[in-house]
UniProtKB/Swiss-Prot annotation:
Tree of life domain: Eukaryota
Descriptive protein name: Maturase K
Any single GO CC term annotated in Swiss-Prot or TrEMBL for this entry: chloroplast
Organism from which the protein derives: Amburana cearensis
Keywords, comma-separated and alphabetical: Chloroplast, mRNA processing, Plastid, RNA-binding, tRNA processing
Length: 508
């Protein structure tokens, strides 16, 4: 973010009007590749002494407009369909630089929003996806109903371009955007095919993620705009928290009330609900409320009408599920969460009389989805579908140290992520599967049985790291209080350094 401000030096009042000329600036491509490559990427041929040239970018954009889309040669099969030239050079140069340029408006807006909200100091902790669960523990125990909302995607590309026009006033820039998207996706299709989306995501993931997050940001901005324009609702301010990596967004609204049509202006007070909470990560959001499901159903159809009428995306009403927190769990960020009653008995004595008081308290349970996680491990060939560990043949060619290190890293990552679980038994089972799979892989490499391998090499102590790693970390934090250590290890621990979901956890 600081690099953008140093290089661009844009006046914020005019920053959205002149994006097209930035495509011809060499430092844009330095920002795109400077952190990954030691030398410049703007090299058309290795014989040019690795000199970067602005003329290359201008030539490439000229070729885009002059290219005949109806003439294809059989010899062009190994070339990029977008350029007709070397795909490893031209497409990477323009696509990565182009993605940096289109991120600039939201980058500067992010910086200003963080400064206005005065949350810059705590921003690093808020970037962690585990920071959502303490919010659940604090707020959701007082709520009764939860709605599981999945944001529909993809949408027509022209809708995305028209949405961008409200934020960026630059006609030449949008001509280039249209041409850029046209070459990657089927522009004439109302709903972009999954095949073209997959191709586009592999060739330019940064720009695709920008478009997706901009689309989500736009539909959530409509909620905030209508709320601020409503004179009946006097609610606290909101905050938009972007994760800097690819602009994934995470928003927590403690008191969110939205009305989606002017016809409801006379009945706003009837729909006011001060106990609505909204949390989103990537394409999945959770809407929870304390009141009756009547309002939740209203919200459900508000979402559907907004997607259909404003973004022209079809969404089935059955795709949004409304459940009761005390009876059903909701799946979010790899955990099954629900609210249950926790009964405790307190004995009180007053003079000669004693009383036994039973107290019921609501508690948020976060459970490891063991069946789904075993399914992910089976897909990755660590076990079969029943959860029985198997060897990993593709790793048997590596050294013993590399094999153990790979299994340990996977085990530590899963343990690190699921240490917030209310019940540790499922986590121990996952550790057992990975531990035994590691032993079987080593035994397969040495052409021995598991028992003979452990007896001959004495590897049991080395493999105990699968179960002792978390205890060692907590012993460093609490070196003198063993009872506190045991209590914390049995309880939930949320880490504020997790900014993405592990591939085995993410089952989307």
């Amino acid at each position: 973010m600081e690099e953008y401000q140093v290089h661009l030096e844009l006046d914020r009042s005019r920053q959205q009007d002149f994006l097209y000329p930035l495509i011809f600036r060499e430092y844009i491509y330095g920002l795109a590749y400077g952190h990954d490559l030691n030398s410049s990427i703007l090299v058309e041929n290795g014989g040019y002494d690795n000199k970067s040239s602005l003329l290359i970018v201008k030539r490439l954009i000229t070729r885009m407009y002059q290219q005949n889309h109806f003439l294809f040669s059989a010899n062009d099969s190994n070339k990029n369909p977008f350029w007709g030239y070397n795909k490893n050079l031209y497409s990477q140069i323009i696509s990565e630089g182009f993605a940096v340029v289109v991120e600039i408006p939201l980058s500067l807006q992010l910086s200003s929003s963080l400064e206005e909200a005065e949350i810059v100091k705590s921003y690093n902790n808020l970037r962690s996806i585990h920071s959502i669960f303490p919010f659940f523990e604090d707020k959701f125990t007082y709520l009764n109903y939860v709605s599981d909302v999945r944001i529909p995607y993809p949408i027509h590309l022209e809708i995305l371009v028209q949405t961008l026009r409200y934020w960026v006033k630059d006609a030449p820039f949008f001509h280039l955007v249209r041409l850029f998207l046209y070459e990657y996706c089927n522009w004439n299709s109302l709903i972009t095919p999954k095949k073209s989306i997959s191709t586009f995501s592999k060739s330019n993931p940064r720009f695709l993620l920008f478009l997706y997050n901009f689309y989500v940001y736009e539909y959530e901005s409509i909620f905030l705009f209508l709320r601020n324009k409503s004179s009946h609702l006097r609610l606290p301010s909101f905050s938009v928290l972007f994760e800097r990596i690819y602009f994934y967004a995470k928003i927590e609204h403690q008191h969110l009330v939205e009305v989606f049509a002017k016809d409801f202006s006379s009945t706003l007070l009837f729909f006011k609900d001060p106990f609505i909470h909204y949390v989103r990560y990537q394409g999945k959001s959770i809407l929870a409320s304390k009141n009756a499901p009547f309002l939740m159903n209203k919200w459900k159809y508000y979402f559907i009408l907004l997607w259909q009428c404003h973004f022209y995306v079809w969404s089935q009403p059955g795709a949004i599920h409304i459940t009761q927190l005390s009876e059903h769990s909701f799946d979010f960020l790899g955990y099954f969460s629900n609210v249950r009653l926790n009964a405790s008995v307190v004995r009180s004595q007053m003079l000669e009389n004693s009383f036994i008081i039973e107290i019921l308290m609501k508690k948020l349970d976060t459970i490891v989805p063991i069946i789904l996680l075993i399914r992910s491990l089976a897909k990755a060939k660590f076990c079969n579908v029943l959860g029985h560990p198997i060897s990993k043949p593709v790793w048997s060619d590596s050294s013993d140290f590399d094999i153990i290190d790979r299994f340990l890293r996977i085990c530590r990552n899963l343990s690190h992520y699921y240490n917030g679980s209310s019940k540790k038994k499922s986590l121990y089972r996952i550790k057992y599967i990975l531990r035994l799979s590691c032993i079987k892989t080593l035994a397969r490499k040495h052409k021995s049985t598991v028992r003979a391998f452990l007896k001959g090499l004495g590897s049991e102590e080395l493999l105990e790291e699968f179960f002792t790693e978390e205890e060692e970390i907590l012993s460093l934090i609490f070196p003198r209080v063993s009872s506190t250590l045991q209590r914390l290890y049995r309880g939930r621990i949320w880490y504020l350094d997790i900014i993405f979901i592990n591939d085995l956890v993410n089952r989307e």
